[in-house]
Design a protein with these regions (language model features):
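Alpha-amylase-like alpha-glycosidases and glucanotransferases acting on alpha-linked glucans and related
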Residues: 4-10, 15-17, 23-26, 60-204, ...
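Catalytic domains of carbohydrate-active enzymes, especially glycoside hydrolases
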Residues: 32-57, 293-300
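Conserved, well-ordered alpha-helix/loop/beta-strand core segments that scaffold catalytic motifs
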Residues: 41, 196-229
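Outer-envelope exported proteins of Gram-negative bacteria
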Residues: 52, 220-222, 226, 300, ...
Length: 415
């Protein structure tokens, strides 16, 4: 079907989300904690840093059900770096929530404290912005003009904070993303919108500095892309026609996986699925922009639930279990061809192909020369033909893990 990509050299990596890095109040950041971590990896000849999605989390703290496929999590903004560059003052830095707390060294993260600190830091950025140089203001304006996703994100964020409910419950002209109504509303919320823009710009600036350091140290940054999108997100709100969701938030079809050995009722994820025929009409424009944004942030990208690019399990919208869904085809090959063309060569994607994988999924993965995944914790069931045993792993196009974020730690597994 397609030419194989150039084999990647063998390397070793570590999977660790930036929230887990020590050295900042509340949680890890895109500042010195990430720089120190990269230097530690380089000192030990570790060439890949893999992480979970960097997107804003949902209310439970999960980045896999984010309110934005394009934005970055404000928790990661490093206040000390902003103060050192005089984007905020030393007094503002000292006054941030959590500033008096000891450096992150506990085994849990307070989501409420992380949100409180990031909100206060965003406010400090806004208050200090009029004092910034013309050069900085111009750089900010230029960046904003290049981010086609930004205005939908900042409007969604401010509206969500204002109404504290899902978008389909907002006043109808706003809920239906009507341009004239949004423009009128935006005129009364300029400061709040500007605060969100500044936050995303600074996050992007700090992460690009991390990218530069990683490249200088010879370390690849390896991100993670959830397949489906939260119903209550800027993406679905602003592109509702691309998803199986009605104006009142009801899903005509929802995502999940069918019953199997582990679950008699399957898994019901509850997010809308894609109206693939509409994506085809746009030549997959939204998907291509989504991947292009991730390529600005990462060198490699794991595509979660890769099997849904071949066939996906579609569950009726009103169902409470995944039992009565049906398999439906996806235009995965067409999408991957577009993405490969955009990339100008080999796709920087890793297929998450764990679980029950059928020949059509394997053919799609192999046809585009995408590496798959192997997990060593799955290997030792006493069966000599177990596909996860190292001696049974054929070829070199695999990412092999001891375990992933879905598994126990290796120590916990062993015990």
């Amino acid at each position: 079907m397609d030419q194989a990509s150039t084999p990647r050299p063998r390397s070793t990596g570590v999977l660790l989300h930036p929230t887990a890095l020590p050295g900042s109040p509340v949680c890890g950041s895109f500042g010195e904690p990430s720089r120190r971590w990269l230097r530690l990896l380089a000192d030990h000849n570790i060439g890949v840093w893999q992480m979970l999605p960097l997107a804003p989390p949902d209310p439970t703290g999960s980045p896999y059900s984010s309110p934005s496929c394009f934005a970055l999590n404000p928790w990661f903004l490093d206040a000390a770096d902003l103060a050192a560059e005089q984007f905020i003052s030393a007094e503002q830095l000292d006054g941030l929530p959590g500033a008096e707390a000891p450096s992150h060294g506990v085994d849990s993260l307070s989501f409420a404290q992380a949100c409180e600190r990031s909100a206060a830091l965003s406010e400090a950025l806004l208050q200090s912005w009029p004092d910034q140089s013309a050069e900085r203001q111009q750089a900010f304006a230029q960046w904003c003009s290049e981010q086609t996703w930004l205005e939908d994100h900042v409007r969604f964020r401010v509206l969500h904070d204002q109404h504290q409910q899902a978008w389909w419950t907002w006043p109808q002209p706003l809920a239906q993303h009507q341009s004239a109504a949004l423009e009128r509303w935006a005129r009364d919320h300029q400061d709040a919108l500007q605060k969100e823009r500044l936050t995303q710009w600074q996050l992007d600036r700090q992460w690009q500095q991390i990218r530069t350091l990683a490249a200088d140290l010879g370390i690849l940054l390896f991100g993670d892309l959830p397949f489906y999108v939260s119903a209550d997100s800027a993406d679905v709100w602003s592109h509702r026609s691309l998803f199986t969701i009605a104006a009142d938030g009801r899903l005509s079809t929802q995502s999940g996986v069918p019953p199997d050995y582990f679950s008699e009722t399957g898994q019901l994820w509850g997010s809308p699925v894609y109206r693939w025929w509409r994506h085809r009409l746009t030549r997959f424009s939204w998907w291509r922009k989504r991947i292009a944004r991730q390529r600005q942030l990462m060198d490699l990208l794991r595509l979660d639930h890769f099997r849904a690019l071949a066939m996906f399990w579609a569950v009726p919208g009103g169902d409470t279990t995944a039992e009565h869904g049906q398999w439906q085809p996806s235009p995965g090959a067409s999408l991957l061809r577009k993405l490969r063309s955009d990339a100008g060569g080999a796709l920087p994607l890793i297929a998450e192909d764990l679980g029950v994988i059928t020949p059509d999924v394997e053919a799609l993965r192999d046809g585009f020369a995408l590496p798959g995944m192997k997990v060593l914790q799955f290997a030792f069931d006493g069966q000599s033909d177990n596909p996860y045993l190292p001696e049974n792993i054929d070829g070199s196009r695999w990412v092999v893990y001891t375990g992933t974020h879905d598994n126990a730690t290796t120590l916990g597994w062993w015990q």
